[in-house]
Every structure is written in C-alpha cells, then in structure tokens.
Amino acid sequence: MADTSPRTDVSTDDDTDHPDLGSEGALVNTAASDSSDRSKGKMDQKTLRRLAQNREAARKSRLRKKAYVQQLENSRLKLTQLEQELQRARQQGVFISGTGDQAHSTGGNGALAFDAEHSRWLEEKNKQMNELRSALNAHAGDSELRIIVDGVMAHYEELFRIKSNAAKNDVFHLLSGMWKTPAERCFLWLGGFRSSELLKLLANQLEPMTERQLMGINNLQQTSQQAEDALSQGMESLQQSLADTLSSGTLGSSSSGNVASYMGQMAMAMGKLGTLEGFIRQADNLRLQTLQQMIRVLTTRQSARALLAIHDYFSRLRALSSLWLARPRE
C-alpha cells in the first residue's frame, strides 16, 4: 500500500498537465483553420472575379461575332443588289443604231423621257428661230423683236429645267451626250456647249459694236472661261478621287473581310458620283447666265442676231453629222 501512493500522485500530475497541452493545440488548430479560411476566401474572390471577367469577355466576343456575321450578311445582300443593278445596266445599256443616223438611248425611262422632251424642245426652238429670222428680214421693230427674244430666252430656261430633272435620273446620259449628234458631241462640255467658245464665235457676227459693248463681251468671255476652267478642274479632281477610291484595297481576294471592304469602296464611290449632278447644274447655270448677260450687253436687234447665229451654228453641226454618216464608205 505504501508503494502505490507515490505512483498515484505522479499519475495525477500527468493527467492535470494534458488538458493544458490540448488547449494550446486547439488554439493552434483554430488559428490555422482561420488562416486557411481567409486564404480560401481570397482564392474564392479571385476565382469569382476571374470567372466574371471570363464571362464578360465571352459575352463581348459573342457580340462581336454576332456583329461581324451581321456585317457579312449585309455585305452579301449589298453585293447581290449591286450585281443585279450591274446586270440591269448591261441589259439596258446605251447603244447606237445600226443605221448610225440617230443616237438612241435605252438607259432607262428617265433617259428616254429626256430624249423625247429634248426633241420637242428642239422642234419648238426651230419654230421660234424661223419666226425670229422672218422678223429680222422684215425689219421688224425693237418691241416685236424683244417679244421674240424674251420667248427664246424663256425657252432656254425650259431646256435647263428639263436637263436638271434628267440629271437626277441619269446624269451619265447627259454627260455622254448620246442625245446629241456625233459632231455636236465633239464639242460637248459637261453636257452642253462652252459659253466662252460661243462668245468667240459671235464676235464677228455682232459688228458693229460700241467700245463699251466690246469690253462687256470680252469681260463676259473671260469670266465664262475662268468658270469653265474651275469646273473642269473640279471634274478632274473628282475623276482622280474616284480612281484612287476604286484602286485602293486588296485586289483578287474574295474573303469576307475583303467583301466588306469592297462594299465600303463602292459606297464611297457612289457618294462621289453623286456630285456629278452638281457639276451639270453649275455648268447649265453658267450657260444660262452667260446668255442672259449677253442679252443685257447687246441691243435688242443685236440680241436677235446673236441668238439666230447660235441656232445656225448648231444646225450646221447637226447637218455636218448627217453628211458624215451618209458619206460613201469604201
């Protein structure tokens, strides 16, 4: 019994020491667990951010892909439409009749309507010129001549109105001059005559003129020449710009990206071609204003003679065309 008591005490001391060690281990384990939880929390936040970024990137990628597919579809539709328009243009292109005595245009209803209106206009003008010639030969008074001259000028205004409407439908028909005879087309400038050249031709037809009239006609001729040069330079710039637009980009490739680029080039070129109508309108305004200024400088009788000389000049050009086309061919 005496031997067992000390062992019992020692055993009791050992038992009292273990709970303290267990508490310290529990604290260490708890701290480690908290650190692990925080690390996992940080990892989870990074993962969530990364996942959110991936989802956003995927969403943007889908949107870009959808937009690209839509762009390709639009380009395909535009290309198909353009091919159809080109096919119609080839089927309804401008041609010259086999007899060669008359220029015909099948460039659409607009061109045909203009040709018909111009023919009626020319027929009416011939009647006016016959009346004016008869009045001059009969030595009619200025009041009678003034009425006829004003009628001729109003008729010219009607021509430029007809041409303005025609330019909206088919500006190339006006520029090509297919509504004119071959000899007239040799002198064609922006769908009509050069005012400065007509004034040169009239110089010998209107004598005698006062010094003031000569100065007025010379100034008008120079002003017209300057305006014509400016319009001609504008046309040259437009042609160069069109050439640059159509020649840019990759040639010979039919990839989807190049189709979109091609359609973009065509859209730019179409926009530039739209300015052609403005050139025709400005050229016709210059022609009309030159005629009106000429009438103001000249007397009534001189104005009548000038209008008659212009008419006779173009009549001779048309007659020359007929003779040329009817010439013997070996």
UniProtKB/Swiss-Prot annotation:
Its main location: nucleus. SUPFAM superfamilies: Leucine zipper domain. Residues 46-66 are annotated as: Basic motif. Expressed in the whole plant. Residues 111-327 form the DOG1 domain. It is found in: Nucleus. Keywords: Activator, Coiled coil, DNA-binding, Hypersensitive response, Nucleus, Plant defense, Transcription, Transcription regulation. One of its GO terms (biological process) is positive regulation of DNA-templated transcription. Binds DNA as a dimer. Interacts with NPR1, NPR3 and NPR4. Interacts with GRXC7/ROXY1 and GRXC9/GRX480. Transcriptional activator that binds specifically to the DNA sequence 5'-TGACG-3'. Recognizes ocs elements like the as-1 motif of the cauliflower mosaic virus 35S promoter. Binding to the as-1-like cis elements mediate auxin- and salicylic acid-inducible transcription. Required to induce the systemic acquired resistance (SAR) via the regulation of pathogenesis-related genes expression. Binding to the as-1 element of PR-1 promoter is salicylic acid-inducible and mediated by NPR1. Could also bind to the C-boxes (5'-ATGACGTCAT-3') with high affinity. This is Transcription factor TGA2. The lineage of its organism: Eukaryota, Viridiplantae, Streptophyta, Embryophyta, Tracheophyta. The gene is TGA2.
